[in-house]
Amino acid sequence: MAIFLLKKSYQLNNLKEIKFNDLWGGHGVFTTMWIFDKSFKILFFKDHINNLIKSAKAYGINTKNLKKNIFKLLRKNLSNSKKYNHLLRIALNKKVISISLRSKIKIKNNLVLKLVKLKRQKPEYKNLKYKEILLHLSKLDTSKFDIGLISNKKLLETGTSNILLVKDKKIYSPIKGFYKGITFRTLEKKLPKIHKKNIYVNQLHEFDEIILVGSGKGVVSVSKIYENSWKRKSLNYYNLISKVLSSEIKKCKKISI
């Protein structure tokens, strides 16, 4: 169960506070960022906000001064005196902007992936059509489990993260049909070449490692797949990718907004 520190909603046209609405299931977009430390830092903040603005325009949310207003609400709701280790979510539709902060869950070392036949709607954008994914996740202890989204017998991503797989000392990711998150995009530039490949469920046994990458989880190694024979054979590339992300975290500066 997520523990929320903050849940606020505002009318987009005048920033007047209204009753909180998480906006799930509606026509709109969102982003989730990791906020941490005192005098808060937000990992990949600029990229998250720019991508949110770009996605909002694609969804017809063309509010004047949108970025400026987002910053105004963040200044109002975040404190330099508080030590954070939370996930900051900003969601938008044409009328409402919602901001929430929930505690970042500590992921167990032996994460299990549970495969479900499900595909994100319009995966090129981080949109709010997310209720089916949330329903599946609500039935699990998300510190120990995640769901692997399967479409046409191919593994695309998880309910929370992008997915990387390792075979013969090469890193692979699905070709298409998934949302490419900000953490994934950043690490993709820093890692050895990532080969694009359709990841069929019946070929998972060929891979030595399955690694999840996302804002909420960071970098996590999957230990096994529920009701599947696949089990982790190595941690080599998990360790490599973790070091790359740790380097990015160390470079993260206090946010000035």
How would you name each of these model-derived features?
Residues 1-76, 93-257:
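Helix-start/capping segments and mature chain N-termini
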Residues 78-96:
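Long amphipathic N-terminal alpha/beta scaffold segment
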